[in-house]
Amino acid sequence: MLRVGVLVSGGGTNLQAIIDAVKSGDITNASIEVVISNKKDAYALTRAKENGIAAESVCIKDFESREKFNDALIEKIDSYNLDLIVLAGFLVVLPPELIAKY
């Protein structure tokens, strides 16, 4: 079973489609472990919680530099021991370290 993390920025319509596909069996051998947003108020986080999925936010405004934000994002993702990251409307340029890792 693949442990999947979904990165989002907004309402989460793409996330909902993925959740629905997992529930219906259209996507097999995968479990959404966490939804991470760069916005604390993203409705996608509500969608995650309503479906029993961990919901986290890592907001760039909470950090004094982009490098510290990148480090925090990678640390948050790593804490879930994920096999795969899905970008579902994540409106942040990914740090090269994250791309190399996943």
Task: Walk through the language-model features, giving the residues of each.
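One-carbon transfer enzymes
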Residues: 1-102
